[in-house]
Amino acid sequence: MLYKGDTLYLDWLEDGIAELVFDAPGSVNKLDTATVASLGEAIGVLEQQSDLKGLLLRSNKAAFIVGADITEFLSLFLVPEEQLSQWLQFANSVFNRLEDLPVPTIAAVNGYALGGGCECVLATDYRLATPDLRIGLPETKLGIMPGFGGSVRMPRMLGADSALEIIAAGKDVGADQALKIGLVDGVVKAEKLVEGAKAVLRQAINGDLDWKAKRQPKLEPLKLSKIEATMSFTIAKGMVAQTAGKHYPAPITAVKTIEAAARFGREEALNLENKSFVPLAHTNEARALVGIFLNDQYVKGKAKKLTKDVETPKQAAVLGAGIMGGGIAYQSAWKGVPVVMKDINDKSLTLGMTEAAKLLNKQLERGKIDGLKLAGVISTIHPTLDYAGFDRVDVVVEAVVENPKVKKAVLAETEQKVRPDTVLASNTSTIPISELANALERPENFCGMHFFNPVHRMPLVEIIRGEKSSDETIAKVVAWASKMGKTPIVVNDCPGFFVNRVLFPYFAGFSQLLRDGADFRKIDKVMEKQFGWPMGPAYLLDVVGIDTAHHAQAVMAAGFPQRMQKDYRDAIDALFDANRFGQKNGLGFWRYKEDSKGKPKKEEDAVVDDLLAEVSQPKRDFSEEEIIARMMIPMVNEVVRCLEESIIATPAEADMALIYGLGFPPFHGGAFRWLDTLGSAKYLDMAQQYQHLGPLYEVPEGLRNKARHNEPYYPPVEPARPVGDLKTA
């Protein structure tokens, strides 16, 4: 053994060839600060070996290196800029020394090589991979850019276009694509990986392969003519501006850095990467996006822990076909859980099956499945007008009309047709679960399971615990949602649960702005372009359905009369009374016509201004700041109340529910992350300006308390230790 660290070791393999093996104590290898320091020590040992002829890097895990340790990021981002810059210089000196070894080097890459893992293998001369490879640089998705030389080496290896596509989009690619673009030199079966890598090294040692020529381009300026450079970088900047926009500075910074570094050799190019990385790491966007990653891990870990002792349902059923029922049935069948889909009429069943078939055909068009797989999946959805097969199902989700009487009747009837241990769930969006449970003999086997539309796209499923729902019931439904590829978040019961309960105060803020003379077009523009929502409130209401929102608003007002009962006729009432239900009937805040792809395209409709004039004061202008404040304060206040009332368990779960269920702008990180970034005292000052607008604008006492003590909602993060300690960590 030449060297043994906590996460890697170095040993002789054969005849002058050494192997450096990543072997962390846990289930995966991460390139954390300690591993970078250990890698530097191992390379120091290699540099002393006079009889070294070649080096093979490999992993003892199912994946090579999954990336940097993102749990360290938030504390690293708090390190002063100069210290962070110094640490990056140290880390890059380690990879440079790996790249500069006076012998050929090869990485035998299995499974994932992402982020720092990818940057590590870019420093070797050759890369041999297994068919299960996923390799790439996802840093821009975390609000940063590659910091271990990825933005320098990858363009010089692949050419500007392929590298920009991966780096700017934060993409990873599979083995075939990696081989095609030159990111790896070969793909072999897992059992032949090490032997294959040794064979390549022997060829390089014997002079059959010119490893020095392979290495040289990575040390030099990027080989691009002026015209090629202009085209590549202009196109990349245009694409990034279109897709990422101003709220996500990392992708455009990465492109500009690669462009600026193109004319320099490795050292100067790495300096430019360093100068770009450090300011990005100190942005609110980076903290928010890293926070989302960590919250996502937390939420998924919680679901895994909850379901460790239960069996995932093997057979499911959906009550109520149509678009929603068909979407749920498709998602279940697509992920391997056969489903019975019941309705009371043929027309709805046909609609449900058509929806499932349409979604499967999209997978076929994208090349994700072949005709055989499509036929196989669709055959596991069984449409029925009766309860045939219900004695075999483990879980049933009801997705009938949003009417408590109808839902109670359907659930009570179904309870008589299933096994005593079968779990029933309701896909209601607003009706309290405990109210529906009154109709059942076994309320402990019942809970809420709120999907979001369109089911195949929206990641969130709210699992609602009723007063009598058992832990096992919740666990089974969480297991099914996870199996469907969804992110289940368990919430406690109340009208609207979590997501709709906090959405309707936001709509109330919108209605009040319109009442006071604001233009809905400007509100939408501000909330989309400035705050960052994917849709403004008017457009969102058109998509959700004005009739759906009108009904849900009444349910919420009955549930929370003190705050959500309104004493005036609003824009939603006016449009509803005029039979303008949004996209579903082509008339809402806008008029809708289908484009060439069959998608609804919005157009101005002057009639709307006349309708809104009946429920509004004369038009006047509002500043962007006032629009954002008046829209967001009611929502954030309600989010805080939900935490204080234990409707939702943690700030992390609340923020993920908002992002995955409503499209809350990820660069803000969620409502609690936004609050922490703004500061609770500053938020309180802002909210107090609008208290006269009513109870929705009154800040909850718990938040006032946070402001008094200057406390954040997320646990404070300590800066990482000084750079000298990081080196030797």
UniProtKB/Swiss-Prot annotation:
The keyword Glycoprotein belongs to this UniProt entry's keyword annotation: no
Keywords of the record: Fatty acid metabolism, Isomerase, Lipid degradation, Lipid metabolism, Lyase, Multifunctional enzyme, NAD, Oxidoreductase
Family assignment from sequence similarity: In the N-terminal section; belongs to the enoyl-CoA hydratase/isomerase family. In the C-terminal section; belongs to the 3-hydroxyacyl-CoA dehydrogenase family.
Enoyl-CoA hydratase/isomerase: region residues: 1-189
Disordered: region residues: 708-729
GO cellular component terms, semicolon-separated: fatty acid beta-oxidation multienzyme complex
Biological process per Gene Ontology, one example term: fatty acid beta-oxidation
Gene: fadB
Listed pathway(s): Lipid metabolism; fatty acid beta-oxidation
Reactions mediated catalytically: a (3S)-3-hydroxyacyl-CoA + NAD(+) = a 3-oxoacyl-CoA + NADH + H(+); a (3S)-3-hydroxyacyl-CoA = a (2E)-enoyl-CoA + H2O; a 4-saturated-(3S)-3-hydroxyacyl-CoA = a (3E)-enoyl-CoA + H2O; (3S)-3-hydroxybutanoyl-CoA = (3R)-3-hydroxybutanoyl-CoA
Site keyed Important for catalytic activity: positions: E119, E139
E.C. numbers: 4.2.1.17, 5.1.2.3, 5.3.3.8, 1.1.1.35
InterPro entries tied to this protein: 3-OHacyl-CoA_DH_CS, 3-OHacyl-CoA_DH_NAD-bd, 3HC_DH_C, 6-PGluconate_DH-like_C_sf, ClpP/crotonase-like_dom_sf, Enoyl-CoA_hyd/isom_CS, Enoyl-CoA_hydra/iso, FA_oxidation_alpha_subunit
Protein name: Fatty acid oxidation complex subunit alpha
Name of one Pfam family that matches: 3HCDH
Subunit and partners: Heterotetramer of two alpha chains (FadB) and two beta chains (FadA).
Role, per record: Involved in the aerobic and anaerobic degradation of long-chain fatty acids via beta-oxidation cycle. Catalyzes the formation of 3-oxoacyl-CoA from enoyl-CoA via L-3-hydroxyacyl-CoA. It can also use D-3-hydroxyacyl-CoA and cis-3-enoyl-CoA as substrate.
Region (3-hydroxyacyl-CoA dehydrogenase): 311-729
Catalytic residues identified in the record: H450
Positions contributing to NAD(+) binding: M324, D343, V400, V401, E402, K407, S429, N453
Gene Ontology molecular function: 3-hydroxybutyryl-CoA epimerase activity; delta(3)-delta(2)-enoyl-CoA isomerase activity; enoyl-CoA hydratase activity; long-chain-3-hydroxyacyl-CoA dehydrogenase activity; NAD+ binding
Residues annotated to bind substrate: D296, N500, Y660
